[in-house]
C-alpha cells in the first residue's frame, strides 16, 4: 500500500512521456512544444478569469440566501482543470479538458452535492454591539495654560 503513490507517479510520467513522443513524432518537436506552452497559457487564463467569475457568482448566491454548493463544485472543477492544463503534458491536458465539459461538471455536482453542507450565519459575520458597557460620549477642548510653562531665554548667537 505504501508503494501505491510511487507506482501512480511512475505511471503518470510514463504515460506523459509516451504521449509526448507520439505527438512529437506526428507533429514535430517544435510544434509539440508550442502546443504544450499554448495549453499552459490557456490554463493560466482559465484559472484567473473563470475562477474570479464563479467566486463573484458564489457571493451573490450567498447574499441571496441560496445554496452556493453547485457553484463551489464548478469553481473547484474549473480551478483543477486550469491547473491540469497548466502542467506540461497531453495526458493532464486531456483530463483538464474533461473537467471543462458541462456534462462532467454536472455529474460531479450530482455526486458531490449530498456530501456538502451549507449553513448561513444569522446577521452576517460581524456585529456592531448593543452599546452596553461604560462608554461615555463627550467633548473636550484643549486650553494651554501659560503658567505651567517655564520661560527659557535663548542665548544662542545667530
UniProtKB/Swiss-Prot annotation:
Cellular component annotations (GO), alphabetically ordered: membrane; plasma membrane
UniProt topological domain (Periplasmic) ranges: 38-78
Cytoplasmic topological intervals: 1-16, 100-158
Superkingdom of the source species: Bacteria
Transmembrane segments: 17-37, 79-99
InterPro entries in the cross-refs: FxsA
One Pfam match: FxsA
Membrane topology annotation: Multi-pass membrane protein
Keywords: Cell inner membrane, Cell membrane, Membrane, Transmembrane, Transmembrane helix
Biased composition, class Basic and acidic residues, residue ranges: 139-158
Compositionally biased intervals (Gly residues): 125-135
Location in or out of the cell: Cell inner membrane
Positions of region (Disordered): 125-158
Family: Belongs to the UPF0716 (FxsA) family.
PANTHER family assigned: UPF0716 PROTEIN FXSA (PTHR35335:SF1)
Function comment: Overexpression alleviates the exclusion of phage T7 in cells harboring the F plasmid.
Protein known as: UPF0716 protein FxsA
Origin species: Escherichia coli (strain K12)
Gene behind the chain: fxsA
Amino acid at each position: 500500500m505504501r508503494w501505491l503513490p510511487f507506482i501512480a507517479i511512475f505511471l503518470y510520467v510514463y504515460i506523459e512521456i509516451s504521449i509526448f513522443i507520439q505527438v512529437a513524432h506526428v507533429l514535430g518537436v517544435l510544434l509539440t512544444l508550442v502546443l504544450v506552452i499554448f495549453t499552459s497559457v490557456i490554463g493560466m487564463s482559465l484559472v484567473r478569469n473563470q475562477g474570479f467569475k464563479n467566486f463573484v457568482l458564489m457571493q451573490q448566491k450567498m447574499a441571496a440566501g441560496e445554496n452556493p454548493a453547485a457553484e463551489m463544485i464548478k469553481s473547484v472543477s474549473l480551478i483543477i482543470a486550469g491547473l491540469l492544463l497548466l502542467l506540461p503534458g497531453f495526458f493532464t491536458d486531456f483530463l483538464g479538458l474533461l473537467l471543462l465539459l458541462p456534462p462532467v461538471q454536472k455529474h460531479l455536482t450530482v455526486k458531490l452535492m449530498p456530501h456538502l453542507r451549507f449553513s448561513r450565519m444569522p446577521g452576517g459575520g460581524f456585529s456592531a454591539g448593543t452599546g452596553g458597557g461604560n462608554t461615555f460620549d463627550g467633548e473636550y477642548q484643549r486650553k494651554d495654560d501659560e503658567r505651567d510653562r517655564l520661560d527659557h531665554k535663548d542665548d544662542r548667537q545667530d
